[in-house]
A protein has these predicted regions:
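Loop-helix junctions at membrane interfaces
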Residues: 1-192
Length: 192
């Protein structure tokens, strides 16, 4: 008897499309003085909610890797810059496994009370902002790119924008999940 395939071709193809979405959204980001207003996390949140933490992690990691390679190239701190986006998908996916009832797709859409999902998305955004600040700090120490004032002077603004953009991404994710419910792209056992 053969083992069931954990990553069928269709699932890998959808992850690839979400990685491309991440990369495309990264070019629509606005970066001003150490603050980045972006919605790239939308792709990893969708992957995490549809397929789970592994896919959410991979979409965030590989999407950020493509962005890093084409915008900045490979440096000693590249892995630090990839950690934040990858953790967003991992946190949302793990929260979906832990809070099965509250974060089940049907419950999010039918009960119209996605408070746990919003809280998890905001927490993930705060984590990403904090990890990116750490990457800024390590970059500043290694390469003297940024000043202490630039890194930590806008920290609270970076945190506030991270929380706000995460809430907006969570709001956009709900209609996407509603659309996914009615497709054959996602197996029924994954939809809940």
């Amino acid at each position: 008897m053969s083992k069931p395939n954990r990553f069928p071709v269709k699932r890998i193809a959808i992850d690839a499309v979400l990685i491309a979405l991440y990369f495309g959204l990264s070019w629509a980001s606005v970066e001003i003085a150490g603050i980045k207003l972006t919605f790239v996390g939308l792709a990893s949140i969708i992957a995490a909610m549809v397929y789970g933490p592994i896919d959410g992690f991979l979409v965030g990691f590989l999407g950020a890797f493509c962005e890093q390679m084409l915008k900045y190239g490979f440096t000693a701190t590249t892995l630090l810059w990839l950690l934040g986006p990858a953790m967003r998908g991992l946190v949302v996916g793990c929260a979906k496994l832990i809070f099965k009832q509250a974060m089940a797709t049907e419950n999010l859409l039918k009960n119209h009370r996605p408070y746990v999902f919003f809280a998890v998305s905001i927490f993930a955004g705060l984590l990403v902002s904090t990890l990116n600040t750490l990457a800024f700090y390590v970059d500043a120490k290694m390469f003297h790119y940024y000043t202490y004032e630039l890194i930590f002077g806008v920290f609270w603004l970076r945190i506030a924008l991270g929380a706000a953009s995460s809430l907006l991404m969570a709001l956009v994710t709900l209609p996407v999940l509603a659309g996914v419910q009615h497709t054959t792209l996602v197996p029924k056992k994954v939809r809940s």
